[in-house]
């Protein structure tokens, strides 16, 4: 084995020189230069500095403006809540431990950080699944006269939390475990060892199949069918131009969210699967650190996409930030009105664009 396994940790360095120490008790500066830990801390501070305001603003603006409180927006707000979980439960912890050079918060802190990071990522993934299914149901109409209502949105929210908990909770109760990874300043699922009594192998397979591959298959199926339906509707001119345009805008926004999720999380998932299938092989601390910390940036892209691609939300956000008056409203009056009308063709089936 090209690493050192201890009680509740695995360090990717053979302890031939005797310098390897527990990541819960000693700085890990023998793994990489101390400056790298400072850089990680600064990176996490940047994510907090951006992630908290944009996600909180998304929640606040939607709650303040009644016209934004549509069923589909409930799911988008769910993404903001998940991101805030990651910011408060994960990022603050990781920034603090990076500043110390080791996981100074001990096993409890590791469990909390790993849990919140996993929970937030899974809520985001399953929210994208619900959005994909909603787009498929509304645009492709496999069920005639289907309207995505408040009851559907609430069921979708409950579904995302149940599925996320089904992935994040088991390591807390003995099916696998959370351990420090990479530079030993953040925690994740134990892909690294076959520690006796934790059944890591079965949990990792369960997680990859049920909480990564199956959701992605559902998403790709829905958007494959969606693409075909949009082309057919455009060719047949079955719906009004404003309705088609509004549905395309919403679908485009959700597709970009899915692509951004894949860009952020696929490197981490790929490296984790490689480590799991090549346990004992040689790899450095940075091998897992880069994809793990890159995945954490997912907390800021969803609200940024939402703000950039949803003109109605942008107008409401500017109004909120400017104390109830939008200084650009007069300049964009006619354009904004036409866009709002297009986005409001059917609040239950076309929101939130």
UniProtKB/Swiss-Prot annotation:
Phosphorylated on some or all of the serine and threonine residues present in the C-terminal region. It is a multi-pass membrane protein. Residues 334-353 have a biased composition (Low complexity). Keywords: Cell projection, Chromophore, Disulfide bond, G-protein coupled receptor, Glycoprotein, Lipoprotein, Membrane, Palmitate, Phosphoprotein, Photoreceptor protein, Receptor, Retinal protein, Sensory transduction, Transducer, Transmembrane, Transmembrane helix, Vision. GO terms for cellular component: membrane; photoreceptor disc membrane; plasma membrane. It comes from Chelon auratus (Golden grey mullet). The gene is rho. The lineage of its organism: Eukaryota, Metazoa, Chordata, Craniata, Vertebrata. The keyword Signal does not apply. The chain crosses the membrane at residues 37-61, 74-96, 111-133, 153-173, 203-224, 253-274, 287-308. A motif ('Ionic lock' involved in activated form stabilization) lies at residues 134-136. The modification N6-(retinylidene)lysine is found at residue 296. It is found in: Membrane; Cell projection, Cilium, Photoreceptor outer segment. Residues 62-73, 134-152, 225-252, 309-353 are cytoplasmic. Photoreceptor required for image-forming vision at low light intensity. While most salt water fish species use retinal as chromophore, most freshwater fish use 3-dehydroretinal, or a mixture of retinal and 3-dehydroretinal. Light-induced isomerization of 11-cis to all-trans retinal triggers a conformational change that activates signaling via G-proteins. Subsequent receptor phosphorylation mediates displacement of the bound G-protein alpha subunit by arrestin and terminates signaling. The keyword Isomerase does not apply. InterPro entries: GPCR_opsins, GPCR_Rhodpsn, GPCR_Rhodpsn_7TM, Opsin, Retinal_BS, Rhodopsin, Rhodopsin_N. Disulfide bonds join 110-187. GO terms for molecular function: 11-cis retinal binding; G protein-coupled photoreceptor activity. The record marks 113 as: Plays an important role in the conformation switch to the active conformation. Pfam families: 7tm_1 (PF00001), Rhodopsin_N (PF10413). It comes from the Eukaryota. This is Rhodopsin. Belongs to the G-protein coupled receptor 1 family. Opsin subfamily. Residues 1-36, 97-110, 174-202, 275-286 are extracellular.
């Amino acid at each position: 084995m090209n690493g050192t396994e201890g009680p509740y940790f695995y360090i990717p360095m053979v302890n031939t020189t005797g310098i390897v120490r527990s990541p819960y008790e000693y700085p890990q500066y023998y793994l990489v230069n101390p400056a790298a830990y400072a850089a990680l801390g600064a990176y996490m501070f940047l994510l907090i500095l951006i992630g908290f305001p944009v996600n909180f603003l998304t929640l606040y603006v939607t709650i303040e403006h009644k016209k934004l409180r549509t069923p589909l927006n409930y799911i988008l707000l769910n993404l903001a809540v998940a991101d805030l979980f990651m910011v408060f439960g994960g990022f603050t912890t990781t920034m603090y431990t990076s500043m110390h050079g080791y996981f100074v918060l001990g096993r409890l802190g590791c469990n909390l950080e790993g849990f919140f990071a996993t929970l937030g990522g899974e809520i985001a993934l399953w929210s994208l699944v619900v959005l994909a299914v909603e787009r498929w149901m509304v645009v492709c109409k496999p069920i005639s006269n289907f309207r995505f209502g408040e009851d559907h949105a609430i069921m979708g929210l409950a579904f995302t939390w149940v599925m996320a908990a089904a992935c994040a909770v088991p390591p807390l109760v003995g099916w696998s475990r959370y351990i420090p990874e990479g530079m030993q300043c953040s925690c994740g699922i134990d892909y690294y060892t076959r520690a006796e009594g934790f059944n890591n192998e079965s949990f990792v397979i369960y997680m990859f199949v049920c909480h990564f591959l199956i959701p992605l298959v559902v998403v790709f199926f829905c958007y494959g069918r969606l693409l075909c339906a949009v082309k057919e509707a455009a060719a047949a001119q079955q719906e009004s131009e404003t309705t088609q345009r509004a549905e395309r805008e919403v679908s485009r926004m959700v597709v970009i969210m899915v692509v951004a999720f894949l860009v952020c999380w696929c490197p981490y998932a790929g490296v984790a699967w490689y480590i799991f299938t090549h346990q004992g092989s040689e790899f450095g601390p940075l091998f897992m650190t880069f994809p793990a910390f890159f995945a954490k940036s997912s907390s800021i892209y969803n609200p940024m996409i939402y703000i950039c691609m949803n003109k109605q939300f942008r107008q409401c956000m500017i109004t909120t930030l400017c104390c109830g008056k939008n200084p650009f409203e007069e300049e964009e009056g006619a354009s904004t009105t036409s866009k709002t009308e297009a986005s409001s063709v059917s609040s239950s089936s076309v929101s939130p664009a």
